Amino acid sequence: MSSRWLNFHEKMIKQRMEKKVDSRYFRDGAVKKPYSPKTLSNKKSSASLGIRRELPSTSHLVQYRGTHACTRQGRLRELHIRCVARKFLYLWIRMTFGRVFPSKARFYYEQQLLRKIFGEWKEEWWVFHHEWKLCVRADCHYRYYLYNLMFQTWKTYVHQQQEMRSKYIRAEVHDAKQKMRQAWKSWLIYVVFRRTKLQMQTMALEFRQRSILRVWWSMWRQRLGQIRVSRALHASAVKHRSLSLQLQAWSQWWEQLLYAQKEKQKVASAVKHRQHWQKRRFLKAWLAYLQIRRVKRQQNEMAERLHHVTMLQIHFCNWQQAWERRESLHAHQAQVEKLARKMALRCTFTHWKHYMLLCAEEAAQCEMAEEHHRHRRLYFCFRALKDNVAYTHLQQIRRNLAYQQRGITLLHRFWNLWWSQIEKKKEREQLPLLHAAWDHHRMALLCKCVKWWLQYTQKRRYKQLLQARADGHFQQRALPAAFHTWNRLWRSHQQENVLSARATHFHREKVEKQVFSIWWQKMVQHRENRLAERMAILHAERQLLHRSWFTWHQQAAAHHQEQEWQTVARAYHRCRRLRKAFCLWRESARGLRTERMGRVQAAEFNAAQLLRWAWSQWRECLALRGAERRKLMRAELHHQHTVLLRALQAWVTYQGRVQSILQEVAAKESQHNRQLLRGVLRRWKENTMARMNEAKKTFQASTHYRKTICSKVLVQWREIASVQIYYRQQEDHAIWEARKVLARGCLRTWFQRWRDCSRRSAQQRLQLERAAQHHHRQLLLEGLARWKTHHLGCVRKRLLHRQSTQLLAQRLSQTCFHQWRQQLAARRQEQQASVRALWFWAFSLQAKVWATWLAFVLERRRKKARMQQAFQAYQGQLLQEGAMRLLRFAAGMKASRQQLQAQQQVQAAHSLHRAVRHCATLWKQKVLGRGREPQPLAPITPSRKVTFEGTLLNRIAAGAGDATLETKRPQAPWSQGALGRLAAREPHALEFNTAHSSRKQPRRPHFLLEPAQGQRPQKLQEHGLGMAEPAGPSLTHPFLAEAPTAPVPHSPLPRALSSAPGPKQAPTASTGPELLLLPPSSFMPHGAAAPARVSAQPATPRHMPQVPPSLASVPGPHPLLPGDFSGIGAGPRLSTAGCLDLEAELEGIQQQLLHYQTTKQNLWSCQRQASSLRRWLELNREEPGPEDQEVEQQVQKELEEVELQIQQLAEELQAQRQPTGACIARIQALRQALG
């Protein structure tokens, strides 16, 4: 037995370790938010420490059952696989998870609860472990059948999960593409809008500089600003491109990592859910059985308690009645004692109250007299002496009255004491009568209680006889019938519980699936919203930087002018302040002289007042202090005399220099005052000594009188209290002896009755316990039989589940390691190729930027007439070619989408077939026991590469001409017409265009196709244009000429049909010498990269021209795609008549939009001119001159004319808004039809 038990104990420990390791492998379904590189470096150490604590140590290896590894080599191979899998799993957990998740804490809490419950269950299950081992050995042949069924169900579940996974992946890919398109469009719209704003600000700065500053200064500043802007734009373009490439690579890597994590987490969650379900089911059955046992025990205990409680209540009621009588007697005696105490206290309290009232009156009168003396003693010294004498007489009279009142109170007190003693004597005489009455009442109550108790006992005996007969009848006939009915109900209830458990389990699984799907969708949405918020924050920060730079530049110039004006004004103001200060100084010097004389006179007067005040304060201090502080008063008086003498000597010397006559008068007055004060002090000292002697004598007499009275009262009170205490003790002793005798008699009777009742109850209890034990034994036998069957089923299921989890763990570890190794090699190749591509692209970008800069410098020297001609010719050709390329691109996109969808379906079917075949081979090897090694999966070929054709020099030369205007902002409003002039009449520009068209374009890697995710759906509707315009120089934003009143549009490139994804100008066959800097999205092939081209389109112009209302009713915006304008489209061609109609309609729309934009720009220029004229008038009115009146009148007239022109232009714009809306709707309808 001991050896078998040790083997079983070791097996249980191994199974627990396997559970721990499996649960830690596949725990935690939540996905952590990705950290940035900086935060990852900081959190790596803390995350590794936390994971080391949570994960099991490497010394405790997982003990798998050796089903297929019977030999030594197989075991070594299995151990090696486990170690490698555990190593890479730990690395993956440390890289992905940085903290303890709520799911981990919840799982740990549930595990601890299960451990506690299992420990309690183990103590009761200990007895039946031997039978369980025998049953398990007998039922081993049944396991293989269950294994087969379990694997079939698991295989169907895996197929369903793979199908669901493929559907989810397709939906996520489609959603990601749509969001990437919207984010890229909104970003390009933001770039276009920002550039137009910057162009308007530069025009405003130029106008102000030309009107205020000198011409040469403005020319120099303009050149310097262009150089700085070009450098800043170049740096920002390179930086932005590198950041976008990094973000795209990171997003692709993160998607692959999330996909691998999803698969692992789903498998782990399925295993964990199955384990929890089995444990809960077993524990519910066991807890129900325990609950039934507890209920029966509680019922028996409640019956016994009721019997004891009833008996105790009967005896307690009798005892309580006797106790209440005794308490009433004690309470009556206590009330009598309280009344005596209250009488004595009341007498003393009235005496003390009268004395305190007298003291309070004396204190109040003293305070009133002192306050009166303080207020009047300065001017009425002699009257104060008379008042003091009168006050002493009045005090003597009041003391006499107090003595009389005290005698009266003492008489009252002695009268009350005498009266209370007489009352006590009367009470003592009547005490025997009271005791006789109380004894008679007590005996009568005892007789009544005895009669009632006898009647109650007779009734109780009769009831007990009836109850015994009824219990016998119940045990013979009703109890067996009730037991059979209860047994039937219990069985039916168990069946209902089983059915309800199955229903709840099915419902719980369904709800968990729904909750998991909803949670997963929310997590994906939350992640996408986070990325969108980050993109929006970056855009907002850049916009704020640009705004702050331009505002600072404007404010610096204004601040410089204001500083110059302020320096002149400050110099003039300083001179005026110096003059005013000199005048004020002269006046103040005169005033100071007069003030000094007044101060001297005021000081003399103040000294006299201070002397009087000091003498008065000294008198008050003498009056307030008593006999104990006389020495201190004399010292203070001597010190005050000395201080006053010194002050008087200083004051006399000072006044002797000024006026000698005043010194003599002051000395005589001081001597006279001293003599008067000495006489007053002598009289006051005599009076105070007499008053103090009288007060001492009166106080001694009063204290002696109080002591004698208190001693007499205490002697009388002691005598009375001792007599009362003696009487009470005698009464208490008699009552206690009587109660003692009664209690003994009651206890004897109660004990006899209790002994009889206890015998009867013990016999009944023995019978009931025997019946209950017999019934419990039968129930336990039935319950144990059912529990054994249920436990055997649970054990079989648990063993099957463990083996399935082991199979899953081995398969996942192998597949994860192979896939990780292949993905690592593919990533390294992709990184190297992307680095090379970025290097070549940077060289080509630099060359393109220099080429475009030279072209713009040449084009600035052309004239307005040639630019307009080139613009008209280019506009016609662009409209013709744009419509054809739009139609071609729509057909090509449809074909490429169908081809991509077919390829994805074929790949999904192939991967599903491979996964099913691999699972089947693994299952055969592990179930049938073959020692063959599993074949490795086919290597995953990396599908994303970056390659370039030709040598390095050819690539750099080919990339030098593709520079776009996306990374370079326009420096002046007239610089965008340069390309049109080159296209029209420059021979060297035509040669440059032919070289550009014949050059090959480099390909772009697939992982750089998708930009950062983000959503800005509402941005397209705020501008009122939907997605009607790709990025490029807008139709609605032609630029003004130098004259502000009649601007001419200089931009020859309309935006409605441009081919670049940023603000660039599309090349055509006729005007092809324009230089383009293409983005990396144009380097990809036409088949696989079509979705990325679609996502790179911007879509918000400001205004569109008028279109007929019949065409504006077609709904649904769709963006124009740039690939049709530069690539080769495959699809059907339209007829010549349809193309001509479409071109004519687009030309009309373009003309309406150009007219609307020119009127808008005229309005802006007029508003700027009006604001500058108002500013000039304000500056001129601050410092008016006689010659500036005529100029102000002329400027005022010009301002009125400009305001009239502004009103007219505003009305025209208001009238043109409806036609432009119709044009926008028409363009959207065309785009939807062609898309």
From Swiss-Prot:
Q: Where in the cell is it found?
A: Cytoplasm, Cytoskeleton, Microtubule organizing center, Centrosome, Centriole
Q: Where does the record place the region Disordered?
A: 1010-1075
What is the protein's major site of localization?
cytoplasm
**Keywords from the UniProt entry:** Cytoplasm, Cytoskeleton, Repeat
Can the keyword Isomerase be found in this entry's annotation?
A: no
Source domain of life:
Eukaryota
The keyword Repeat appears for this protein: yes
Q: Which GO terms describe its cellular component?
A: centriole; cytoplasm
Q: Where is this region: Interaction with CETN2?
A: 104-123, 468-487, 634-653
HAT repeats span which residues? 131-163, 165-194, 263-295, 327-361, 392-424, 1141-1173
GO MF, one example:
phosphatase binding
Q: Which family does it belong to?
A: Belongs to the SFI1 family.
Q: How does it assemble?
A: Interacts with CETN2 (via C-terminus).
What is the protein's known function? Plays a role in the dynamic structure of centrosome-associated contractile fibers via its interaction with CETN2.
Q: What is known of its domains?
A: CETN2-binding regions contains a conserved Trp residue in their C-terminal ends, which seems critical for interaction with CETN2.
Q: What is the name of the protein in this document?
A: Protein SFI1 homolog
| Taxon lineage | Eukaryota, Metazoa, Chordata, Craniata, Vertebrata
